[in-house]
């Protein structure tokens, strides 16, 4: 009779242990599902905030671009416009990343190439003109 009690108690303990393990697995899977849902909600909220921020920045950039486009521009205003255009391109590339690279290669127009060339010219010609000026100044002093 003792043997039957030992087997019954052992069976009871084993079944109780199996039920607790099963409940632990279920609670872990439920916890995982809840965490996944909360992460989706957070991502959704982040996406909404990001799109609202992009829209606000685009609006601000357009307002500033219109302000600078209507009047006469100084060199500083021209640089501000270039920066605004770059910001607009960056914001557009966030919306459509595939089209951004195509737009950037098309946007590299003749004016930008000319600007790059004149900057390089100034870097090269500045020191050369300085040397020529010094040489001519030295010759004039020797002659005079």
UniProtKB/Swiss-Prot annotation:
Residues with PTM Asparagine amide: 70
Any one GO BP annotation for this protein: defense response to fungus
Compartments, record wording: Secreted
Keyword annotations from UniProtKB, A to Z: Amidation, Amphibian defense peptide, Antibiotic, Antimicrobial, Cleavage on pair of basic residues, Cytolysis, Fungicide, Hemolysis, Secreted, Signal
Similarity comment text for this entry: Belongs to the bombinin family.
Function recorded in the entry: Maximin-4 shows antibacterial activity against both Gram-positive and Gram-negative bacteria. It also shows antimicrobial activity against the fungus C.albicans, but not against A.flavus nor P.uticale. It has little hemolytic activity. It does not possess a significant cytotoxicity against tumor cell lines. It does not possess a significant anti-HIV activity. Maximin-H3 shows antibacterial activity against both Gram-positive and Gram-negative bacteria. It also shows antimicrobial activity against the fungus C.albicans. Shows strong hemolytic activity.
Name of this chain's protein: Maximins 4/H3 type 3
Organism: Bombina maxima (Giant fire-bellied toad)
